[in-house]
């Protein structure tokens, strides 16, 4: 990864006796990520998002690997379409849907400064429930890889999800950095895989997580000197951090 947090970790991780341990998150089975391949110029891929009744605002991020280029169309639940927006540098392109009364602000960045890839950032306001389609049409295609994310499950309505989710590439920032030990978790009580734990690879193909540790129904200490039972990659991250300290 090349984000601000990731670069900071990369820089400081080269110092002696310094180890960064980052949990990969618990988004493996939350339907908040999808990805796919546009085979050739003119091919169409629909990214479908079911928006829940309580979901009024939603950010959507789409990455297109360089040097591929696409056009974006957005189709509302009633069938209204904003057609063939080109993925070139535009800031705060405002579009409105007549029937839904929904407004979206679309930012294209191509190439994005740190990666050279195309980045589409969509902010949707006053969303109406139903299936929204974000249609990608190949304009210039080499390998055609694209990736899309919505916020983590805990931050959005339970009914809001991708209709064709992918469990891979679901590790959270900044665990994508090469300068940290990225930690997933498994069920140490029966030695089984846990579907909630974030899955690699990273978007640029780095192998993550680096390691997994037990993180299911673990007895942990809490403020005030009491104990509690917790589950998640943060528990596993704490175990690995302790091992590094030793």
Report each predicted region and the residues it spans:
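Low-complexity, Pro/Ser/Thr- and charge-rich linker/hinge segments at domain boundaries
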Residues: 153-167
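Active-site neighborhood of phospho(di)ester-bond hydrolases with catalytic His/Asp-centered motifs
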Residues: 20-25, 183-184
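Noncatalytic modules at the cell exterior or secretory-pathway interfaces
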Residues: 56-58, 124-140
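Short acidic, glycine-rich surface-loop motifs adjacent to enzyme active sites
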Residues: 1-2, 23-24, 137-139
């Amino acid at each position: 990864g090349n984000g601000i947090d990731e670069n900071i970790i990369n820089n400081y991780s080269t110092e002696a006796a310094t180890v960064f341990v980052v949990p990969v998150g618990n988004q493996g089975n939350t339907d908040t990520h999808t990805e796919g391949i546009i085979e050739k110029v003119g091919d169409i891929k629909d990214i479908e998002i079911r928006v829940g009744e309580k979901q009024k605002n939603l950010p959507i991020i789409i990455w297109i690997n360089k040097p591929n280029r696409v056009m974006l169309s957005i189709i509302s639940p009633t069938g209204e379409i904003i057609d063939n927006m080109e993925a070139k540098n535009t800031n705060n392109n405002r579009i409105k849907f007549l029937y839904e009364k929904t407004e979206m602000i679309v930012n294209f960045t191509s190439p994005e400064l740190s990666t050279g890839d195309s980045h589409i950032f969509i902010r949707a306001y006053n969303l109406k429930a139903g299936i929204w389609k974000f249609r990608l049409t190949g304009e210039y295609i080499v390998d055609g890889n694209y990736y899309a994310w919505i916020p983590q499950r805990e931050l959005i309505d339970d009914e809001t999800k991708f209709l064709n989710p992918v469990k891979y590439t679901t590790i959270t920032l900044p665990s994508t950095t090469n300068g940290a030990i990225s930690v997933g978790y498994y069920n140490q009580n029966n030695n089984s895989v846990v579907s909630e734990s974030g899955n690699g690879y990273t978007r640029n193909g780095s192998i993550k997580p680096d390691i997994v540790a037990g993180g299911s129904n673990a007895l942990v200490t809490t403020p005030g000197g009491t104990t509690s039972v917790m589950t998640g990659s943060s528990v596993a991250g704490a175990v690995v951090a302790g091992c590094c300290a030793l």
